[in-house]
Design a protein with these regions (language model features):
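Aromatic- and Gly/Pro-enriched helix-to-coil junctions and flexible linker segments
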Residues: 1-72, 77-224
């Protein structure tokens, strides 16, 4: 074996230098409500992402505190991080829903500040904001009428879906709490059952994490 130590410069380097945490520190403050409504497998976090991936580079779990101002400190925000988000990730650290995002990462004394204000990060609220509002409501209640008289707009969708009998599939509920497999919403999004109803809804949501999110919401009791 070659003795590679013979040609070093003789100085002893402190090992701690190579172990010091890389990058900046984020301090996030705000009132963040609804964390406890998420089931196992999901985490409400502040996270750093780069442009290339939906997987978080660095994360810090946010404690479940209702109606109280909290501050969360996340260290190790490297230069690879281009956005910081208040979001929900799955077990693989993949972004499922983002509630707030910040790409101005100006640091003062190596500290980035993020004030999120008051945010509802509840599971159903996330589905409403990021799925129903963006994908479903333009046909279901966004205008003066709603397709199939089904309103999926904010404040109306929960009543319209949960424990409501389907008008299209006899004997089934639109959402049966505790059983996605027996819910028309699940079947509608994951199969072509609705292709004979005038519109194939399975084209609407192709993101696997979002389909899983809706199933997990139903299977965990379909709470509001």
């Amino acid at each position: 074996e070659t003795d590679i130590t013979s040609c070093d410069d003789g100085r002893i380097y402190e090992k701690t230098e190579t172990l010091s945490e890389e990058g900046r520190t984020l301090k996030m403050s705000g009132k963040i409500n609804g964390i406890s409504k998420w089931p196992d497998g999901y985490s409400v976090v502040v996270a750093g992402f780069n442009d290339e991936s939906e997987y978080a580079v660095v994360t810090k779990t946010i404690p479940a505190v209702e109606d109280d101002e909290i501050q969360v400190t996340m260290t190790g925000v490297s230069d690879k991080v281009t956005t910081i988000e208040l979001c929900v990730i799955n077990k693989l650290r993949k972004r499922v829903i983002s509630f707030q995002s910040m790409d101005d990462l100006t640091a003062v004394d190596d500290t980035i500040l993020m004030d999120v204000g008051t945010v509802n990060v509840g599971m159903y609220h996330g589905i409403q904001e990021k799925v129903f509002n963006t994908t479903c409501a333009h046909c279901h209640g966004g205008s003066s009428s709603a397709a199939a008289n089904l309103y999926l707009t904010e404040g109306k969708s929960y009543e319209a879906l949960v424990n409501r009998p389907s008008k299209k599939v006899d004997g089934m509920l639109l959402v049966k709490p505790g059983s996605a497999q027996e819910s028309v919403l699940h079947t509608l999004l994951n199969t072509t059952i609705s292709s004979t109803w005038g519109y194939d809804h399975s084209k609407e949501i192709v993101s696997s994490p979002i389909l899983t999110l809706i199933d997990d919401w139903i299977n965990n009791g379909a709470q509001e």
